[in-house]
A protein has these predicted regions:
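Residue-level signal for beta-strand positions within conserved beta-sheet cores that form or flank
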Residues: 20, 53-55, 112
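Non-heme Fe(II)/2-oxoglutarate
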Residues: 109-143
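Catalytic core of non-heme Fe(II) oxygenases with the double-stranded beta-helix
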Residues: 26-95, 122-134
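A short beta-turn/loop motif at secondary-structure boundaries
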Residues: 16-17, 108-110
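Signature of the catalytic double-stranded beta-helix
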Residues: 1-31, 35-38
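Hydrophobic residues positioned within well-ordered beta-strands of beta-sheet architectures
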Residues: 20-22, 43-45, 114-118
Length: 143
């Protein structure tokens, strides 16, 4: 439900969303997660149950992957940086578009680092005209 509030507030979407895949990761000391993106989904998220000070997730702008003119700004910000660092703290959830390249820096502590990641797709009516479709799903119910 928290993600649907996020999608309504920031993207103005009215669709419901479902989690299609999820997994837990353990990063041992010195482990790193190199740049990657997620396929077959629209949004992704990651939950950080416990992190140490200075932990972050790094997003790389798509434009960084193509040859282009590169001006030297007098200061870097979200718009002119190739990478955007998002600092996280214990209990944080970060949502992002699944196509965005992202990485997790080396675990420089002597303890394991854990996170839970997940992917979303929209349900209901999506698209327009001859590209429109309707996605349904069955909710799992416990007795």
């Amino acid at each position: 439900k928290e993600f649907e509030r996020y999608a309504r507030l920031h993207y103005l979407y009215t669709n419901k969303f479902m989690i299609t895949t999820s997994w837990a990761t353990r990063s041992k000391p010195k482990d790193v997660s190199y740049y990657h993106s997620h396929n077959n989904c629209m949004f992704s998220g990651v939950y950080y149950p416990e992190v140490r000070k200075g932990e972050k997730i790094i997003f790389r702008h798509k434009d960084a992957m193509i040859h282009q003119f590169r001006c030297n700004p007098k200061a870097y910000n979200h718009y002119n940086s190739l990478d955007v660092n998002i600092s996280v703290k214990s209990g944080d959830v970060v949502f992002f578009r699944s196509h965005m390249l992202h990485s997790i820096p080396h675990n420089l502590t002597n303890k394991n680092r854990y996170s839970i990641a997940f992917n979303f797709i929209p349900t209901g009516y999506i698209g327009y005209g001859d590209s429109a479709l309707e996605i349904h799903y069955e909710e799992f119910k416990t007795k």
